[in-house]
Amino acid sequence: MSSVNWNTLLDIDNHRIPHLIIKHKERIGSLSTNLGKVFEANIQQSAKDQGLFFYRIKDVNPMAIKRNFGVSKNNYDCFLYAKGVLFPLELKSTKSKSISFSESMIKAQQIKHLEAASKYEGVLPGFLFNFREPENRVFFIHIKDFLTYKNIAEKQLAHTYISKVNKSSIPIGICEEIGTEVRWMKKKVNYTYYINKMCEELIQGGDAKHRQG
């Protein structure tokens, strides 16, 4: 019986293991992306079911950007229109307890264009942050409140927040303080989000301070 060449096997494994790790990370990233898309689809369907105008901006093909085809990146994910107010929205979903400020999660141009939209009367731009674990929760965070927090967090400035301030992310606790929580009802698989109630809260009082520019 021929002997086993352990050096050869180890060499094969040393080449395979990094490849398997990369593949595993790709699968995890793909799953996270898919769950983010499910969240976006649930928001869109909820708005439609509640008779709200909702326009989802089509994603730009990443390969087109990579190959420099002259296409521009989206300013944000979608527009929502309710009761005479326009809501430019960027949707983010995570299984973590905080949303990272990193470029891979929140892109600079998204912040830039949401901030630019806030200068117009009758426009309430912001993020919809979905925290999937330990229980599903969603918050609307006005871009101005987000930027105020981000500046304080990154520069470690004095503040009046009750919750812990993370230097490189915005946690659930801060969202509870500065945001408007979106209520939901779970179906068999998907969620119905009460977008109409969120809009009413923001328009009637919750974000009245921001409508003056």
Report each predicted region and the residues it spans.
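Acidic-basic catalytic patches of nuclease active cores, encompassing PD-(D/E)XK
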Residues: 1-69, 205-208, 212
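A structural signal for short, well-ordered beta-strand segments and their strand-loop junctions
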Residues: 56, 88, 126-129
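Short, solvent-exposed loop/turn segments at secondary-structure junctions
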Residues: 62-64, 96-99, 135
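Basic/aromatic recognition patch in beta-strand/loop cores that engages polyanionic ligands
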Residues: 71-75, 115
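Conserved catalytic cores of phosphodiester-cleaving nucleases, focusing on short active-site segments
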Residues: 78-80, 84-96
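Mg2+/Mn2+-dependent nuclease catalytic core
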Residues: 94-120
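Nucleic-acid nuclease catalytic cores
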Residues: 115-149
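Intrinsically disordered, low-complexity terminal regions enriched in charged/polar residues
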Residues: 139-213
